[in-house]
Structures are given as C-alpha cells and as structure tokens.
Amino acid sequence: MFSGIVEATAQVVAIEHDRDNIHFTLRCPFASELHIDQSIAHNGVCLTVVRREADTYVVTAMNETLRRSNLGGLQVGDEVNVERSMLMNGRLDGHIVQGHVDDTAECTSVEEDGGSYIFTFRHNYSPELARRGYFTVDKGSVTVNGVSLTVCNPTAETFQVCIIPYTYEHTNFHAIGVGTKVNIEYDILGKYISRLQELS
C-alpha cells in the first residue's frame, strides 16, 4: 500500500530481458536501505526487490505489468518515480494507492500557469471500463506515474492535473511532454463502488 507521495526518482542503469519478463536495475538515494522482498512503487507500479547491491537494486516486471504500464518503454538513463510502502503509523498525505496500475494515458497538453503547470491526459474509455470504475471525477483522486493528484476538468476520456513547482522538479513530471505515456491508477474507492453497483 502506498500514498502516492513520491520519495525520490531512481535512474534506470540496466535492463535485462528474460523471456517475457524484464529485470530493471535502478539507482536511488535509499537503495542501501532496501532488502529483498520489499515492495517499491515505480511510476506507480508495485514491484518486488529481488536483488540489491551497494547503491542499486533489481526488480522484475512480468508480461501483465508490462502490458498495462509504461515500464516496457523504459530505457537506460530514464528517471522513474519511486516510493517505499506506506508506514501504517504515519499520516496518509496522499490517498490510498495500491500500486496496481490500471492503464496508461497519453499527455496531450502542458500549460504553464503562473509558475505552476496544468497537464492534460487522454486515457482509454468505454462503457465497460467505466462500469469497472476506470474513470475520473472532478476533485477526485488519480495516481499518475505514482504521484497522488487531484483531478480537474474531467471528461469521459480526459482529465487535467495541476502540478506545483516542487512536484514538477522532484518527480519525473519535468520529463513529461505532449505524447508521453504515463501510468494511471484510478481511485480504488470508485472501483469498489462501481463493482457493488454491478452486483446489486
């Protein structure tokens, strides 16, 4: 379980393909504190640490993860937003994030707004996806590349988020431009409500 408050960015230093799996080696400030079997969110995707050295660690993404996320497009040198799992004795500063990415979305616009930034994203839409809770609501929560954000101006297939300078500079949002594919996780509460309505 995560909160969507990104701790740092990690740099991809090696990529190894193993049949349908990809092993990613990453370097980040807290790598030396990690241990095997620990869960880390990478651009919002929960992955397990399988190997660790002094300042790097390795995680494996399987086919299902690669199909639903942007991890398969990573290259050596890319920045990835990372967050360790949430401590249950602390404040929930973001929102409840599972690290189970639902789909990807494409950035269609980046606008400067008096020192902050407004990003517009287009995501897959169908009535079936909406029935499963894959939609956004105004002032609801959404996770973009692992960052907990508030939705603005949603339509059936687009939404906007407002990014303050700190978030822009300390996450990989500064590398997102028109055409960039990002990972999105819809609000778990909306998915549960949609499922309950479907079963009632």
Task: Name these PLM-found stretches.
Residues 1-200:
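Conserved loop->alpha-helix
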